[in-house]
Amino acid sequence: MATPSMMPQWSYMHIAGQDASEYLSPGLVQFARATDTYFSLGNKFRNPTVAPTHDVTTDRSQRLTLRFVPVDREDTAYSYKVRFTLAVGDNRVLDMASTYFDIRGVLDRGPSFKPYSGTAYNSLAPKTAPNPCEWKDNNKIKVRGQAPFIGTNINKDNGIQIGTDTTNQPIYADKTYQPEPQVGQTQWNSEVGAAQKVAGRVLKDTTPMLPCYGSYAKPTNEKGGQASLITNGTDQTLTSDVNLQFFALPSTPNEPKAVLYAENVSIEAPDTHLVYKPDVAQGTISSADLLTQQAAPNRPNYIGFRDNFIGLMYYNSTGNMGVLAGQASQLNAVVDLQDRNTELSYQLMLDALGDRSRYFSMWNQAVDSYDPDVRIIENHGVEDELPNYCFPLGGSAATDTYSGIKANGQTWTADDNYADRGAEIESGNIFAMEINLAANLWRSFLYSNVALYLPDSYKITPDNITLPENKNTYAYMNGRVAVPSALDTYVNIGARWSPDPMDNVNPFNHHRNAGLRYRSMLLGNGRYVPFHIQVPQKFFAIKNLLLLPGSYTYEWNFRKDVNMILQSSLGNDLRVDGASVRFDSINLYANFFPMAHNTASTLEAMLRNDTNDQSFNDYLCAANMLYPIPSNATSVPISIPSRNWAAFRGWSFTRLKTKETPSLGSGFDPYFTYSGSVPYLDGTFYLNHTFKKVSIMFDSSVSWPGNDRLLTPNEFEIKRTVDGEGYNVAQCNMTKDWFLIQMLSHYNIGYQGFYVPESYKDRMYSFFRNFQPMSRQVVNTTTYKEYQNVTLPFQHNNSGFVGYMGPTMREGQAYPANYPYPLIGQTAVPSLTQKKFLCDRTMWRIPFSSNFMSMGALTDLGQNMLYANSAHALDMTFEVDPMDEPTLLYVLFEVFDVVRIHQPHRGVIEAVYLRTPFSAGNATT
C-alpha cells in the first residue's frame, strides 16, 4: 500500500476557485440557507440585491451606498495617493466587492490624438490639388487660380458687382468674405458670356503653399471670411488683408475680365502631412514646384484609458503598496508580491465569468481586439467583372457646334428654323473614364490597414521631409510611408496568409482595435477631457471581502504616468508627445449588505469565529517570471533549485517584447517609452508562434513525462519546419503532440474526434478559438530553372496606373506585369507549400496534474518518481525563433495563491497568505 505522502493531492486540484459551500464551515452554510428566503448570500457572498423586509428601524436604516472622502491625499509628479478611514458601524457588514474609487480629473491626450481616419478638411480634393495661389518668379507674381463667381461688372475700387438694390444702384462684393469659395455656377451647362465678369479668391505668395486636401484656415469674421487682420495705419483699426487684382484676356488687353481677391490667411493642416515635396531652396514657401506637393491624412491614433483601467492602480510590494489595516491592530491585509500579476488575473477572471466581447462603459470594460481580416489576409481577389465608368455631368463632353440645314433640290441650304450655330452635338459614344472601384478599395484597405503597420525597417522617409530622430514619437511614425507594392492586391493572391513581417507586430496596436476605439470615444473626440470615472478594486485578497464592524485605514496609489494608464493605437510615447493627466478628487463609494440588524449581528458573530474565516484564491494562482531573451537568441535556459512540487499545477508561457513590458516594481518606469497594448497586463499575447520546442527535466534521474507520447521524453516539440514523418497537424506546422497537450490542458479533451470544447470553456483567451493554421504556395526556386529573383524596385504590376515605390502620383506606362509568377493555370510554375500558424491571446500550457505525473517511469509502488522523492530541481530550455529586438520569456508557474482573512475583534484584520511551491514569491529562491 502506498504511503500517505505518496497519495495524489486531490485537494489541490480546484483550479478555478471553489464553490462557497466547499470552503465555508457547516455552521455558516446552514446560516446562509436559513436566511436564504429574504437574503441570498450566494457563492462567495456575492449577491447584495435583496433588501430586508423587517427589523430595520427608520433611524438606523441602511443606505445602500455611502461616499467616503479621503482623510489624506498626496499628489506627486508620478502618483496620487489617497487614504480613507472606513468606519463600519454596529450591525453592519461592508461589502468590499461593491466598493469603487470615484475619480474626477482632467486629461490632455496630447497633439498626437487623432480619433478618425482620413481628414476633416477638403477630404474630396485630389491629394495633389493646390489651393488657388500666387508665387514670385524673378520678382514677378504668377497666379494659378479659379474664378467661379460670375458678375455683371468690375469696378476698380469695389471689385465685382453681385447685383443691384431697390433703387437700381450696384451692389459690390464685400471683400472680407465675398466672393465666397462655395458659391459659383449652379448649372452644368452655364457658360461665361462675353460681357460677363468673373471673380474668385486667391492666396497671396506670402501664405505658405499647401495641398487643398487637409488645408484649413480659421475664420476671422462671422461671415466666414478668413483673411488675416492687419492694423490700419490711419486709425489703428483692424482690417482684412485683402487686395483686388484685375486680369484681362489677350483678346481685350485693356478691359478687366476677372478680379481675384488676394489675401493672406492663417493656413494650417491639422490632420494631414506631406508625403511628396519637391526639392526647393530652404525657406521657400511658395513656388511653381510647390504646386505639386502631395498630402496624406495623419494616421489615426485613438487614446483612452486601458481596459478595466489597467495600470491606473498601483499593485506592488516595493514600498508603494496599498493598505487595508484595522486601526486597532495596524496589521496590513494587503501583501502583494512582485511576481503576482493582479491585472492579468482580473482579465482572465472576467473572461471566465462572461462574454468579453460585450462592452460596459462604467468600468471601462472594452477588451482589446483586432480585425481578423487585418491579421490574416484572405486575399480572394476582387469581383470586378463589370467595368465601372464615370461620366460628364451633362452626359456628354466635348461637342461640335453645328448649324441647321435643309435640302434644296440637289444641294443644301441653311434652315431658318434653327438658330445659327445653335446645335451642340457630340460625335460617337458618350465620353467616359473607367475606374476599377473594387480593386482600388481593396488596395486602399491593404495599404491603410497593413502596409502602414509594417515594421519601421520596411518603410521610407519621403524625400525633402525631415522627421524627428526619436522613433517613438507620433511625428516620426506618422511621417514614414510604406511602399504600396510591398503588399498589393496581387501579393499572396488566392491565399489565406499573414504577411510574414507582420507576424511579430502587435496586431492590437491598430486603429481597428474596436475596444480601444470604444474607450477612446467614451471620453469624447477632443484633446482635452474633464473625466469622471469609476475604478473597481482588483486585488484578490480584498476585492470580495466582507468587512465587519470596526474602524479601518484604506489607502491606495494611483499612477499618473500617461504611458501606463492610457493606451494609444500607435503605441507612441505619450510623455514626449504631450499627454498629461491631473486628478482633482478621488472618493470611495461603498455598499453595506442590506441586512436586518439582528441578521447582520448574527453573521458578524459567526465570521468572528476563526473556523469561518474568509478564504480567497487569486484567479491566476501563479508565480510569474520574466526571463530576458537577447536579440536574435534562439535558446533560453531556466533553472529552479530543488523543492517539493506538491500542489504544482503546471506551466503557462508566452513571449513578450521588452519594449512593451513595463517594470511593475516602480511607480514610474523611465524606460517605458510606449503606450500600446501591454500583453503582460492585458492578455494581448501575439508571439506564441515563435516557440519551437521546450524541454523539461526534473533532475537527471526523472523521466517526465514518459515515453508513451508521440515524441521523446522530457521534450515538447511545438512546431516542425521539416515534417518528414508527418507529425504536423491541421494543415500547418504545429505538431500533433502539442495540439493534443493544448486540448488536454485547456479543455480536458484527449479524444480528437468530432468534438469541440463547450462554449463556456471556449472564450476569448481560449486556445481553440485563437488557433489559426494557414498555408500557401510559393515558387520553387530550385526546380524552376527559369526563376529570376526580381527585387521590389524592379517589379512592375499596374505600371503607369500607380505611383513608383511610394503612395505618390501615378507614373509610368501601361505594360505587361513581370511579377508575380503564376501558380495556377496551364503555365503554373513549380511550387513549394509553406505552412505556419498564429495563436494570439492564449498562453501555451503544459499541465502537471496527478494524471500527467503518472506519465513517467513508475516505481514498484506504481507511482511516478516525482512522488517518491520529496524535492527535485527543475531545468527547462525553450527554443524560440530569433527576433531582431530584445524580448522576454513570460512563464507562469501555476501554484496555489490563497489568502485567509481573520477578523477576531473590532478594528482587527489579519491575513495569512499561502503559496506553494513558491512560498517566497520568487521562483529563483
UniProtKB/Swiss-Prot annotation:
Localization per Swiss-Prot or TrEMBL: Virion; Host nucleus
Coiled coil: none
GO biological process, one term: symbiont entry into host cell
Highest classification ranks of the organism: Viruses, Varidnaviria, Bamfordvirae, Preplasmiviricota, Tectiliviricetes
Chain's role: Major capsid protein that self-associates to form 240 hexon trimers, each in the shape of a hexagon, building most of the pseudo T=25 capsid. Assembled into trimeric units with the help of the chaperone shutoff protein. Transported by pre-protein VI to the nucleus where it associates with other structural proteins to form an empty capsid. Might be involved, through its interaction with host dyneins, in the intracellular microtubule-dependent transport of incoming viral capsid to the nucleus.
Principal localisation: virion
Gene Ontology CC annotation, any one: host cell nucleus
Protein name, as recorded: Hexon protein
